[in-house]
Amino acid sequence: MDFHLTKEQLLVRKMYREFAENEVKPLAAEIDEEERFPMETVEKMAKLGMMGIYFPKEYGGAGGDVLSYAMCVEELAKVCGTTAVIVSAHTSLCAAPIFENGTEEQKKKYLPDLCSGRKIGAFGLTEPGAGTDAQGQQTTAVLDESGENYILNGSKCFITNGNVADTFVIIAVTGKTTDKRGRSMKEISAFIVEKTDKGFSQGKHEKKMGIRGSSTCDLIFEDCVIPKDRMLGKKGEGFKIAMKTLDGGRIGIASQALGLGEGAVEEAIKYTKERVQFGRRISQFQNTQFQLADMHTRMQAAQYLVYAAAMKKQNHEPYSMDAAMAKLFAAEAASDVTRRAVQLFGGYGYTREYPVERMMRDAKITEIYEGTSEVQRMVISSHLGVK
């Protein structure tokens, strides 16, 4: 696989890096401390096309590619995990499933506003009793007597962008069906929900360990009325759509983890070259050099996995296992590398005077959302034929 970036990719990467350094980094500590969603940053990203990078221009997108999107999330995460996941969830979990599964009318209606950043997107799959077990959905969607609307009842939890989003892709149970072995199972479908829909509400902001500026909340459906033409895909295709959406989402989260780890390495190199102990810069100690060598190597390996998955998705090749491998490795590498960075900083690393403690807190969630590390191992082993 050719990992050489094109001239255009190098240019947009430079733009993302400069934007992250000049516009995102100065606010990162503040939005973490205040648990504040950085709407002003989202508006600036929208003007640069960063909210719809790999969608066609005919739908309002930037007309870029999936690798450019991954690099955008990566560069943002180097300085702010919160801002990175805002773009990832909006793009991979809302705009992407509409683009990949929607009717032409749905794409023309929703994508221009999402790609321009006029509206923010979110995805509702996780429920209080259905996290890793996506088949455990309890939210229902029942066709009303007129046959024109679905009535949704239930709730979703831990929804990224939840309190600020305008457009949601929601997974709900629409009946019962049977599997290939004749066993009864839930029929699951996908819907597009708008913030203004009757019977829909958003819950309180969750107080989190990391990505504290990210809006995370419950979504509540109480006889929520959804026109039937807002079903995404066909009836009963919701589980397939959800799994396909998560495959793409894992590239986004792997990119977030990659950026967090790389950012921690950069901070650690800079600090160890300045910090003096026992009359020497601590970068001169062999232990420090070996630590940094291991940290950089892990993140370089993670980058290859992430870029490979992104390129396979762009080329319309099967990429489910690649996305799972990228997320598994990048997430666990980021958690390890950010922890090591804090250790290299010593007591200062444990304070908020430096960003590495925030990076460590932000990195942990990448091992959990959009499929835990254990789920990624299940996905990978399944593709290997180990069942």
Outline where the language-model segments fall.
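Flexible, small-/acidic-enriched active-site or ligand-binding loops
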Residues: 136-138, 198-225
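Flexible, glycine-rich active-site loops centered on histidine and acidic residues
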Residues: 95-101, 123, 135
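Short Gly/Pro-enriched turn/cap motifs at secondary-structure boundaries
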Residues: 129-132, 158-161, 181-183, 208-215
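Alpha-helical interface subdomain recognition
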Residues: 1-89, 101-106, 115-118, 131-134, ...
